[in-house]
C-alpha cells in the first residue's frame, strides 16, 4: 500500500428540512388550526480515529463527503426525520486543519476519538409555532438552516515511541528489521525507503513500543527538498530519536570520500542537526542517541577507535552505540535502554500529574 500522509477533503453537512405549512382537516372540526411540523435537522460530518488505518491513501480517490439533508416537516404535526451523519475514518495521529483559516481544529491521537468538522443545519419551524391570538391561521413557516461546509487539510503524524533519522543508506531499514517484525525494503542504494515504516519492538511478553523508520533525509530537508518537511514532522511525536550514522564512511589518503553515504561521520551528524533545528528546534530538545552503524565493515578495534574519536570531536554527552545492523550485533542493548527510558518518562509524567492536582 502506498503511504500517503497528506490529503485535502471537502466536508458538507446536511441542510435542515423545511418547516411545513399545513392545517388540520377533519370532519366536524371546521377550524382545526395549523398543524405543520418542523423539518428534521441536517446530518453532521464527523471524523473518527481508527487504529486499523495507517495511511490517508483513501482520500486520493474520494475527496467530497456529504451528510444527509433533513426531511421536511409534514402535516398532523409530524416532524421530519433528521439527516444521517457522515462518519469519516482517519488514522490515529491525523491533524485536522481548516484550509480557509489555517487553524488546527483537531488532533486525533486515540482510537475512537471523534471530531465534529461540519455541523448540520437546524430544521425549520412548522406553522404550528406561529399561531397567536391575532393570527389563528398562520401561513408562515421557516426553511431549514444551511449545513456547514469546509475544506480540510489532513496531515498524518505517525505515533511512534522511537524515530530513526539519518542520511540515505546509513542502514535504518536494516536496523528496524533487526529489532522488530517489520520488513521494509532493504538494498544497497540511497532512498530505498520511500515511505515511513513502523515496527513493533517486544522486550517482554507485555512490554513493547513502536519504532518508526523515517526515509533518509538530505541537505535542505527543512525546506522541503526530497519531501523533507513531510518526513520530519513524523518525528515530532516521538519520545526518543535514534540518530544513525554510517561509521564506515571514511576518506582515503588524499581526503576524498570513497565509501559510505558520501559524508564523513561528523558531517552526517552536524548537517542533520542543522536540518532538525531549521524545521523545529524542539526536536533537538528530545532525547537523541547516536547509533554508529556498519561496524562490521572494518576490524573491531578500528571501529571502536573511530567511534571514540568521533564522540570526542562532537563533544557528545548523550548515549551512543556502536552496532552492526546486518549482523544485529549491539542492536538489542539499545532497545532495552529505550524501554528503561520510557518507563522513567512515564513515572515522571505520573508524578507531575499527581503534584498538579
From Swiss-Prot:
GTP-binding listed as a keyword: yes
Binding site for GTP: 166-173, 191-195, 213-216, 293-296, 324-326
Domain Obg residues, every copy: 1-159
Keywords, alphabetical: Cytoplasm, GTP-binding, Hydrolase, Magnesium, Metal-binding, Nucleotide-binding
Record PROSITE patterns: G_OBG (PS51710), GTP1_OBG (PS00905), OBG (PS51883)
Enzyme Commission number(s) from the entry: 3.6.5.-
Disulfide bonds: none
Keyword Cytoplasm in annotation: yes
MF annotations from Gene Ontology: GTP binding; GTPase activity; magnesium ion binding
Compartments, as annotated in UniProt: Cytoplasm
Cofactors (names): Mg(2+)
InterPro entries tied to this protein: G_OBG, GTP-bd, GTP-bd_Obg/CgtA, GTP1-OBG_CS, GTP1_OBG_dom, GTP1_OBG_dom_sf, OBG_GTPase, P-loop_NTPase
Enzyme class: hydrolase
Binding site residues for Mg(2+): 173, 193
Gene Ontology cellular component terms for the protein in this record: cytoplasm
OBG-type G domain residues: 160-343
SUPFAM superfamilies found in the cross-reference section: Obg GTP-binding protein N-terminal domain, P-loop containing nucleoside triphosphate hydrolases
UniProt-listed GO biological process terms: ribosome biogenesis
Family according to the record: Belongs to the TRAFAC class OBG-HflX-like GTPase superfamily. OBG GTPase family.
Quaternary data: Monomer.
HAMAP family assigned: GTPase_Obg
Job description of the protein: An essential GTPase which binds GTP, GDP and possibly (p)ppGpp with moderate affinity, with high nucleotide exchange rates and a fairly low GTP hydrolysis rate. Plays a role in control of the cell cycle, stress response, ribosome biogenesis and in those bacteria that undergo differentiation, in morphogenesis control.
UniProt xrefs under PANTHER family: DEVELOPMENTALLY REGULATED GTP-BINDING PROTEIN-RELATED (PTHR11702), MITOCHONDRIAL RIBOSOME-ASSOCIATED GTPASE 2 (PTHR11702:SF31)
Protein name: GTPase Obg
Gene from which this protein is expressed: obg
